[in-house]
Amino acid sequence: MGTTPTIVKSRRSTSVHWMRWLVVVLLLLTAGWFAWVYRQIVATSNIDNAQPADAIAVFGAAEYAGRPSPVLHARLDKVVSLYDEGMAPVVVTLGGGSDKDSGKTEAGVGRDYLLANGVPFDRIIAETKSLDTEEQVNSLANIEERKNFHHIIVVSDGTHLFRIALLCKRAGLNVYTSPRAPLGRIDDIDAAERMMHEMLSYTALRMDLRASGIRLWLEGRSSKS
């Protein structure tokens, strides 16, 4: 006995009904996830957890012809302040991205800036090979093991620190996050883009996305701060 058109139509209607509910549930879960990530990023960016440690590590940002960009400048000023307060005896500058005109690296420019602002040469470790946040964390973990550090203050943009904290935890690092000072009024579109970048980057990290194109974009190798 064949299936009647009415029964077939009923089954299709039921399938469509459940598909719609599935889509709604997935959208709600996705919205909930990104709302949680957003809140965590904001919370981390608004709290300075700096306390006495073995070292201060500053994550790299763009440099122009051997001079720190405004973002890197602000990060380095934060490091100088922490060092002058006696928070740690050693500073680690991270970042191997180099300027093709000057040949300088982010870490090298950071070291030069710190030297010019009173941090002794023998108190600075410049890591000049890493190209993205994850590589910088891995390099920092190697330095931590080699130097027998136990606690490290990590300095970067406030919105960057939530992801850094997760990467450091995975690398076995005990860190205190410390955001740089704001640069002033940021364009709403630029601020939204930065937040979206970090939300997607954190999500990709939690999902262990390793597709090269996605990873390069999310890690910001193709653009400078």
What is each model feature region?
Residues 188-218:
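A transmembrane-helix-recognition feature enriched in membrane-embedded lipid enzymes
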Residues 13-19, 51, 120, 206, ...:
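Serine/threonine-rich low-complexity intrinsically disordered regions
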Residues 2-7, 36-195:
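A structural signal for short, hydrophobic/glycine-enriched beta-strand patches
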Residues 222-225:
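Extracytoplasmic/luminal low-complexity segments enriched in Pro/Gly and acidic/polar residues
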Residues 5-47:
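N-terminal type II signal-anchor transmembrane helix
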